[in-house]
């Protein structure tokens, strides 16, 4: 996601003044977004947080491993509903979003075979350590199968290549994969709310909305 911002999208941290709504004891939605530095992991997470607040839901977020340097591991936890901590507990993720395939594997501990849906981008960014160690990057099907043993479903999306086809840049891969998630109704936030936040951040006629809508059509 890129463009000129009107209102800063930022990490929610512990919580900003949440407007809580009535929720059932187990009414919560847990998302973990991962990738490497420069892919827009934090931006996507903060977009979800703003959308959750817009719908007057209790939202808590956390960024793990600090502000990653470019190509370093990045992880963002987004929790919504009846939650009191910022970190998603083990075996509690409803949704995993991996903007880099290999980065999805360390998140297996958060997955539940009965409910977790994982989305992974097909484009690989090989870690420098693999060249140093002389190891090979696993095939995308191998990564999918390894993750599938922990999840209810794993969906591979050509997010980077499709974003580049639409805009000329893979920068918008995070928005493209979000569009697919919305299309499949795998997230507890309304499409109209996401679009409203994007309009507030980048204006009504911005490329992020174009990418989102293209992903939802295809």
Question: Whereabouts are the PLM-identified features?
Answer:
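Active-site cofactor/cluster-binding pocket
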Residues: 2-9, 13-218
């Amino acid at each position: 996601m890129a463009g000129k911002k009107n209102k800063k999208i930022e990490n929610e941290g512990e919580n900003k003044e949440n407007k809580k709504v009535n929720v059932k004891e187990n009414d919560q939605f847990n998302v973990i977004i991962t990738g490497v530095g420069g892919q827009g992991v934090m931006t996507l997470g903060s977009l979800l947080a703003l959308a959750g607040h817009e719908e007057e839901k209790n939202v808590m977020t956390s960024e793990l491993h600090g502000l990653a340097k470019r190509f370093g591991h990045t992880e963002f936890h987004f929790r919504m509903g009846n939650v009191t901590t910022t970190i998603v507990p083990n075996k509690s993720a409803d949704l995993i979003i991996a903007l880099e395939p290999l980065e999805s594997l360390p998140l297996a501990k958060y997955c539940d075979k009965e409910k977790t849906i994982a989305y992974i981008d097909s484009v690989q960014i090989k870690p420098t350590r693999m060249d140093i160690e002389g190891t090979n990057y696993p095939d995308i099907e191998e990564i999918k199968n390894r993750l599938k043993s922990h999840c209810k479903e794993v969906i591979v999306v050509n997010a980077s290549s499709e974003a580049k086809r639409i805009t000329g840049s893979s920068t918008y891969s995070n928005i493209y994969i979000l569009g697919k998630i919305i299309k499949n109704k795998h997230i507890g936030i309304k499409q109209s709310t996401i679009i409203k936040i994007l309009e507030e951040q980048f204006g009504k006629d911005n490329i992020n909305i174009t990418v989102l809508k293209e992903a939802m059509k295809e």
